[in-house]
Regions:
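Formylglycine-dependent sulfatase
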Residues: 1-337
Length: 337
């Protein structure tokens, strides 16, 4: 009997594809570049929302956030309402599940390290192991196939600040400020260049973490039967995070699939982050529920490429701007309500 593939997901938080493999000449990303050289890179992958919890709710369910009531972000005080959910949590339709629940029911060991932030409370059935020590190495039977998620938080927006919790995020900036390309919608000032430099340093740090995970796969003899995904929830910085411009929803997407994808492949078809869930299920041979709105782009159940991707912005914290966006390969239409 052929062993089913393992799946390793590595999420870079708040991260536009400022990677060497995407043509960025400033970035120092050897692990990402190696992964892309051994697999495929998508140039038109997009998130369904430009902020954490709505975007992640779409990823974990394979559903548009606007379809399951998770399109708002941090929309309450965080206090519990009687014995019900916390006030900022949505209550999703009863038939919608975290797709890891389907994998678990089919025999996969599922671990998540460590962020959830789905805008709804993840059920106890979502993960075998969820927390700061979550790892495929914790599975009781090492013969079990696994789905392991690692969320690399160093690239989170908060680590672009000069200080965090009263301490400098980076005491010294190890990037030449003059080499940095400032987007035309930012003022070209020293402060802005320093913020962008911190972003590059955060990406470099996360790249090293990715390298450690890849070495762990090799050490465990798992690299040849593990499909590795790198993706992000949404973009960074002002005009990126929280806004459905390309700078806010364009996601890096790299997949290393030994014997399944030729190394160094560049693919330009449209992919939405809600397609990640059905794609993993397709690769693992797990039946997809009919209500799932994402479509598989790899594996036995892969579908035809999308014509359009969709994104939405709703009430985020105290801000209530309502925006919808649709994009094809060339144009994007954005509607403000």
């Amino acid at each position: 009997m052929v062993k089913r593939p393992n799946i390793l997901w590595v999420s870079f938080e708040d991260c536009y594809p400022h990677f060497g493999c995407y043509g960025d000449k400033v970035a120092r990303t050897p692990s990402l570049d190696q992964l892309a050289a051994e697999g495929a890179l998508w140039t038109r992958a997009f998130s369904t929302a430009p902020v954490c919890s709505p975007a992640r709710s779409g990823v974990i369910t394979g559903m548009y956030p606007v379809s399951i009531g998770t399109h708002h972000h941090r929309t309450g005080s965080g206090e519990r309402i009687g014995s019900l959910a916390y006030s900022y949590e949505a209550v999703i339709p009863h038939y919608v599940k975290c797709f890891s629940e389907y994998l678990r029911a089919d025999g996969y060991y599922c671990s998540n390290n460590a962020k959830t932030d789905y805008q709804f409370a993840p059920p106890i059935t979502a993960w075998d192991d969820c927390g700061a020590t979550g790892h495929w190495r914790n599975r009781p039977d090492t013969d079990d196939s696994f789905f392991a998620v690692f969320n690399l938080g160093q690239t989170h927006e908060s680590n672009m600040w000069e200080e965090k919790n009263g301490e400098p995020v980076w005491p010294e900036l190890d990037f030449d400020l003059e080499s940095i390309e400032v987007p035309p919608y930012f003022p070209d000032t020293k402060k802005v260049r320093e913020s962008i430099a911190r972003n590059y340093m955060n990406i470099e740090f996360a790249d090293r973490q990715l390298g450690e995970l890849m070495r762990a796969l090799e050490e465990d003899g798992l690299a040849d039967n593990t499909i590795v995904f790198v993706w992000t929830d949404h973009g960074p910085m002002p005009r990126g995070k929280r806004w459905p411009y390309d700078s806010g929803i364009r996601s890096p997407l790299i997949v290393r699939w030994p014997d399944g994808l030729p190394g160094g492949t560049v693919r330009d078809e449209l992919v939405s982050t809600i397609d990640l869930a059905p794609t993993v299920m397709s690769l693992c041979g797990v039946e997809m529920p009919r209500h799932m709105q994402g479509r598989a782009f790899l594996g036995a159940k892969a579908e035809a490429p999308r014509e359009y991707v969709y994104a939405a912005r709703d009430r985020y914290d105290e801000m209530y701007d309502t925006v919808r966006a649709v994009r094809d390969k060339r144009f994007k239409y954005i509607r403000h309500y």
